[in-house]
Amino acid sequence: MNREQIAEALRQNQVVAYPTEAVFGLGCNPQSESAVKKLLDLKQRPVEKGLILVAPSLDFFRPFVDFEQINDEQLSHLQGKYERPTTWIVPAKSTTSHFLTGKFDSIAIRLCDHPSVKALCELTGFALTSTSANLTGEPPCRTADEVRLQFGADFPVLDEIVGDARNPSEIRDLRTNQLFRQG
């Protein structure tokens, strides 16, 4: 499928696969509880874990992140350029769905400059959920063909290439700089 078709599927609250910096991600509209539930069911992912959101700019995260709790130094860390994709744990707004935050009062976000992510966010007007495109016990998909093999020939997948990152994103807490996952 092309970008416009995938964007329309996202607007229709479907779960789609799209390329990110290292692997294909499964994504949906984070403001649609039904879409997020479909994603969690598909991945067999416990709601308590929460999800990562990706977007090309901070504006896409405004509905979810409590920016009033982020100081200027932390904001510059958040917007910094890093050698590897970096996901930040940040304060969530109290109105952010527990389907996104899990059992936490924070949410995981990543500024992503991958052209596919940027285009989909701009076409839809919202950030995307991002969890690796793979079934439990299977390796993350690195091509659209691998997505189709794991999820079926009719699964909506953006047939573009992943970035050149070798590993999933590093995950750090913005307030403490604690490392949760090495990238």
From Swiss-Prot:
GO terms for molecular function: ATP binding; double-stranded RNA binding; L-threonylcarbamoyladenylate synthase; tRNA binding. It holds the Pfam family Sua5_yciO_yrdC. Its EC number is 2.7.7.87. Keywords: ATP-binding, Cytoplasm, Nucleotide-binding, Nucleotidyltransferase, Transferase, tRNA processing. GO terms for biological process: regulation of translational fidelity; tRNA threonylcarbamoyladenosine modification. PROSITE patterns: YRDC. One of its GO terms (cellular component) is cytoplasm. Residues 1-183 form the YrdC-like domain. Its main location: cytoplasm. It is found in: Cytoplasm. It is an enzyme of class 2 (transferase). InterPro entries: DHBP_synth_RibB-like_a/b_dom, Sua5-like_dom, TC-AMP_synthase, TC-AMP_synthase_SUA5. It catalyses: L-threonine + hydrogencarbonate + ATP = L-threonylcarbamoyladenylate + diphosphate + H2O. Belongs to the SUA5 family. TsaC subfamily. Required for the formation of a threonylcarbamoyl group on adenosine at position 37 (t(6)A37) in tRNAs that read codons beginning with adenine. Catalyzes the conversion of L-threonine, HCO(3)(-)/CO(2) and ATP to give threonylcarbamoyl-AMP (TC-AMP) as the acyladenylate intermediate, with the release of diphosphate. This is Threonylcarbamoyl-AMP synthase.
